[in-house]
Amino acid sequence: MARHKIALIGSGMIGGTLAHLVGLKELGDVVLFDIAEGIPQGKGLDIAESAPVEGFDAKFLGTNDYAAIEGADVCIVTAGVPRKPGMSRDDLLGINLKVMEQVGAGIKKYAPNAFVICITNPLDAMVWALQKFSGLPKSHVVGMAGVLDSARFRYFLAEEFKVSVEDVTGFVLGGHGDSMVPLIRYSTVAGIPIPDLVKMGWTTQEKIDQIVQRTRDGGAEIVGLLKSGSAFYAPASSAIAMAEAYLKDKKRVLPCAAHVSGQYGVKDLYVGVPTVIGAGGVERIIEIDLNKTEQKMFENSVASVEGLCKACGDIAPSLKN
């Protein structure tokens, strides 16, 4: 049986980290694509040379030609410009939309049967545009946001409660931006809801509110510290979890930017919701009950995403079809 083929479109910091993780987890052969000559080839060779030490067998091909991704089982898209200090994800819209048009055409031509995971920001608008540019089924084009946002939320909660991250579940809905909605009452430590832990005296509501805000600012915090780029380790790990769920038909419940068509009162939009990911791609969207406060926060988040998608349509009229 042939190994899976995983195409990484964009060979920057996330792309290189993704390639290494694919090797370490033995998920398949890797094609690293980038428009910059030498970068994907150099990173591919460097990672391949770690294989004898780490003990994995996989091919790593660096390329500047979309033809090399032909027949890929999974495409993970990181191509585009990352954030710099002081920038919001939304500031990248015009530049990265043009990149998505090129990437969409490449995937449409060479990997129409792939499961596509988009990481490029502003995430919710870029994955919406990528699906339209590529013409792939909506179930097979998703955005990596919720896994990362939830991971940050879980890490901060684990630090606050001084417990293992493995025992913390965290729930984040909505767009991947300042309006994301971390849901406290659906987040737990070993099954105990966070509001109960507040009542038990483990923490205060004020500290939980601070953690919620830090989660919203999670990406900006790292951008501010790095000063010359954005996060790449945790985003790469998050995308790999999604790819693994698809390749191994794990039916994992993962929050991601999925195409919503009626659920949560939203139509024809990509926004962060809990999903089941298996061999069929996004096989199900889980619709949970929101209270009035949560619903209002979610609607604000959706409105923000709608605004970005409208802006995309103004730049590229073909997206309005």
From Swiss-Prot:
Binding site for substrate: 83, 89, 121, 152
Phylogenetic placement of the source organism: Bacteria, Pseudomonadati, Pseudomonadota, Alphaproteobacteria, Hyphomicrobiales
Residues annotated to bind NAD(+): 10-15, 34, 96, 119-121
Record CDD domains: LDH-like_MDH
Family: Belongs to the LDH/MDH superfamily. MDH type 3 family.
Gene designation: mdh
Residues annotated as catalytic: 176
Organism: Chelativorans sp. (strain BNC1)
Enzyme Commission number(s): 1.1.1.37
Keywords annotated in UniProt: NAD, Oxidoreductase, Tricarboxylic acid cycle
Reactions the enzyme catalyzes: (S)-malate + NAD(+) = oxaloacetate + NADH + H(+)
Residue stretches in coiled coil: none
BP terms from Gene Ontology: lactate metabolic process; tricarboxylic acid cycle
Protein name: Malate dehydrogenase
Gene3D superfamilies according to UniProt: Lactate dehydrogenase/glycoside hydrolase, family 4, C-terminal (3.90.110.10), NAD(P)-binding Rossmann-like Domain (3.40.50.720)
Molecular functions per Gene Ontology: L-lactate dehydrogenase activity; L-malate dehydrogenase (NAD+) activity
Known function: Catalyzes the reversible oxidation of malate to oxaloacetate.
Enzyme class, spelled out: oxidoreductase
